[in-house]
Amino acid sequence: MGTMTTLTIHRGTHEIGGSCVEIRTDKAKILIDLGMPLDYDKHTTEEQTQIRSDAAEWCKGVDALFLSHAHADHYGFLGLLPQDTPIYATEETFAMLALDGILGDDPTEHLKKHPLTSGQSCEVADIIVTAYTVDHSAYGSCAYLVECEGKRLSYSGDIRLHGVKGVLYKNLPKGVDYLLLEGTTVLRAKNNPTEREVENRFVKAFGEASDAMHLVWCSAKNIDRICALFRACKRCGKTLVIDPYTANVLAAVAGLNPKIPTTTTAEQMKVYFPPRLTTRLTERNKDQYIYSLNPKQNKVSYDDFAHSPEKYVMLVRPTVLTYLQRIKAARIRLIKSIWGGYWDEPNTERFRSWVEVHCEQVKDIHSSGHADTKSLQRIVEHIRPQMIIPIHTDSPSSFGKIFSESHIFYTSTTIGQLSCNSAHARARRDSTPTVRFDDIHSQPITELIHSFTSS
């Protein structure tokens, strides 16, 4: 008798973020990602307890976890994994997660870490998993190919084609049976700007107010964006000033890629030291994250900002507001280089209020970390899967507007059910969110991709 392989999507079929996928055979059980929902903090304490309890249940009996990248909506519940569980990810992802230990705890500290390079395979009993580097706003992101029971399943993770390494999608294996494809921005017709175009927009913005001090709100883990910002600063004769957390993130990544600028290798990159952050590091006996940055040589002070504010571009986030309140500059402008939804979060209210009073202009210069509609089509054109399974999306039905319905496996909107809406199995409905590989029927693809016209 052959083995039975099941696929369970615990979360992500009708939700952006919080992804967790389980693949189980008679001999092994693996998880891909173990994310915290993006809206976790908005839930009641009772709801949060249930969410964590569910995730802990998924972790029982797991033989290994494969992590796609270092964003909390994919790794936020790693702490629930049993002690010494093997975890696989790229070296860059592990480096990013280790930096979580600056302000908190490394979520992989209790796990057995196994770094993977692109194209490298590993075996967990009868399951073979291969990592493939892809482009995303989190440095070191990867997709996975899972092979078992004669079937091949590709998990896209979070992916885009307009980034610095966008062309890497062409390395993804072709002709897989199933493609779990992210759809964060499905049906968004607009093309995303490249990081080079973002850089040029920074340059233009700095030139429009060359005598102003510029603040840029950007994620410390978006390495490609910080590099684009740094290049723009160099082109405009300005100095990029970053906080200790960002400086340590860059230093860690530069250990794997010497092309990444750091405060010790780049003359036009300096550090500011928010008292709240430095005090917290000192209290946690983590002064090394301060002194390794050579403050005597690399520090930019309040006096420096006051004397020549136009010389500086400062990387900020809402948590450094106390520091910003002490800066004296005649003209200040803010550039948001981050997902727009963060601006309206309740915890940014005080920051927004300060910006409204002290910044003469607020500009958006950003590019998504996710594939747009045309990019999703290009990915599918390259891979040519037998069946597409939407994930990391709040609009799975939208996949039917750009791909052939007969090749999309939908889950139902009811938690705990999984329905197959393929042309061969529309009537099927299981009582659990689990399905056998052989129950996802497929056929050779013809005219898989629909033409897409924006409304």
Q: Where would I find each of the regions flagged by the language model?
A:
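Intrinsic-disorder-associated, low-complexity terminal segments enriched in Asp/Asn/His/Tyr and depleted
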Residues: D158, D430, D439-H441, H450
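Short acidic-hydrophobic, aromatic-tinged amphipathic segments that line or gate anion-handling sites
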Residues: K112-S118, V271-P274, F409-T411
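Hard-cation-handling environments
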Residues: P193-Y323, I327-K328
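Cap/insert and terminal regions of metallo-dependent hydrolase folds
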Residues: G163-Y245, A329-S404
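Charged, glycine-enriched surface loops/patches
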Residues: F403-N421, V435-F437, I449
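ATP-dependent carboxylate-amine ligase
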Residues: K328-R331, L448-H450
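His/Asp/Glu-rich metal-coordinating catalytic cores
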Residues: G2-F66, A72-D224, A228-R235, T239-V241, ...
